[in-house]
Amino acid sequence: MKYLYLLLCTLLGFDTMAQTGQSIEFTQIRQELQKKWPDNRTVNLVFHGHSVPSGYANTPNVKTLQAYPHQVLEAVKEIYPYAVVNSITTSIGGENAEQGAKRFKQEVLPHRPDILFIDYALNDRSIGLERALKAWEKMIKEAQKQNIPIILLTPTPDLTEDILDDKSPLEQHSRQIRRLAHDYKTGLIDCYATFKEKRKNGEDLNIYMSQSNHPNEKGHRVVTKLILNYFFEEAQWNEYCQKQTMTIMKKVADWQLMNFENQVRKGSQWANSHAYWAWTNATMYIGMAEWAKMSDDPKYWDFLLTMGEKNKWQTGPSIYFADDICIIQPYAILFSKYKEPYMIQNSVETLDTLIANPKHNSLSYYSEG
């Protein structure tokens, strides 16, 4: 199971190792998140910025639960089950850093952030580097007066700009934010560099975007993974990866259960292509059996038993056609669990016949298409 989930982590794009924030402030937050009642307290994660942390997707649609502030909350709660955590967004769509700085004392600091995230660069292009710098510095200084740990974010992409252009406005704002993080010793989430690297590696950034300047759920997931480096140690990354992989596997298995009979009834242009014994289903049964071993829900074994009963534990019509006898392996798996001879009786007879009567002539066949 260990190797299976690590493989799936790789295939599904989860990081199993990550560098964590090194500041003692972030270490203290991780320690706070591990405390149990009655020694714990509420931890406030405050996200200040524009439309991206607000959850704007295809404007005017707002998908709050797909945005990185909510994704971070879900992930943190997955690993810190005893923590009381609030994800608070003080962001406003269309706002730039100057506007955000004006309401900072009245609308952000009263939330008493344990960690403050600032994400304004996309909209700061309208006010330029100098004005943006003053606004960011104002917010940073006001937060640091109250000893609030800060994480600055470089922008997510805008597809109307060439992200590979080192002189683009967003690249210039990203450099300025990196300097701010260095000068004020804040945390840094370098979204821009991450997406830029993806583009350099040949990825189409459209798959991460709802519209030209708003990421979709997958794009927000990229930002979330960067943020989680401040919350997870290596062992916690492994645990989170495993839980996320298990969640996805369960969704896939449950979809199969929900839609299986419709697929069998629908069939296709090829006769028997979706019969209970068909190889297409047999391979799915094998995967379902592996999932059933990992899950604590008996419904997956019940599904496989029902399949065997509906199929009367028979193979397909031709013993010399591998597709028609592929179903024997799921039967064997069920027999190994339940030890009921009737589950493999027909399979044993089929294999005995095949061994006793080997074919020496060609098994080629013609199929249209």
Language model features with spans:
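Bacterial Sec-dependent N-terminal signal peptides
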Residues: 1-21
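Sec-dependent signal peptide cleavage junction
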Residues: 16-27, 238-247
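Alpha-helical cap/lid subdomain in secreted, periplasmic
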Residues: 24, 28, 34, 38-39, ...
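Short glycine-rich His-centered loop
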Residues: 32-63
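Short catalytic helix/loop segments, enriched in acidic residues and glycine
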Residues: 62-77, 308-309
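Low-complexity, Ser/Thr/Pro/Gly-enriched N-terminal "stalk/linker" regions
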Residues: 239-306, 341-349, 353-354
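Well-ordered alpha-helical segments within folded domains of soluble proteins
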Residues: 277-292, 320-336, 369
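Aromatic- and glycine-enriched pocket-lining scaffold segments that form the walls
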Residues: 361-369
